Design a protein with these regions (language model features):
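Surface-exposed, low-hydrophobicity beta-strand/loop segments enriched in small/polar/acidic residues
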Residues: 1-159
Length: 159
């Protein structure tokens, strides 16, 4: 479980698809800019993925699974989405997540960036001089279980 239920969702975006395999909610997704096309809600090319050093889209709020839907169904109570389906992305608000680089220990007030080494993770290490990878701000340090409160505010700084 990478995302706790204690969260505040001020703004979400439901215009993106996730097709990069399976994913656990709570990580930072980036735009799959190579495939983006159009601005309509059902543009199949508008995709997000767990990536490193990409343009942040927000925090993934669904579990992406790859199930045989002829034998079983998606668990609606877990917010499961089939691979290739639409996902909900948090663009403004705060969450408690453990999708944080294992090698860092963020402090309250540190800026949260997309990790340059671990796909889907957040870090407090700035990727060079650009602020375009900033997702928001850490509002706490990691607790005993590895979770930290992260305030998300996107779109962020434009470089």
């Amino acid at each position: 479980m990478a995302l706790k239920a204690d969260r505040y969702e001020e703004s979400t975006d439901i215009s993106f698809f996730y097709n990069e395999g399976t994913a656990t909610r709570g990580g930072a997704v980036v735009l799959d800019a190579a495939l983006a096309s159009g601005a309509a809600m059902d543009q199949g090319g508008n995709k997000v993925k767990y990536g490193t050093a990409g343009v942040p889209a927000g925090i993934l709020l669904n579990d992406v699974v790859n199930k045989d839907l002829t034998r079983t169904h998606l668990n609606q109570y877990k917010d499961e989405v089939q691979k290739g389906g639409k996902v909900t992305v948090l663009t403004r608000g705060w969450v408690l997540t453990d999708m944080i680089e294992t090698s860092i220990d963020p402090a309250a007030g540190d800026i949260a960036y997309i990790s340059a080494s671990e796909a889907g993770d957040l870090t407090n290490v700035a990727p060079g001089s650009s602020g375009s990878l900033a997702v928001g701000r850490f509002m706490s340090q990691k607790d005993a279980d590895g979770y930290a409160k992260v305030y998300v505010n996107l779109p962020g700084i434009v470089a």
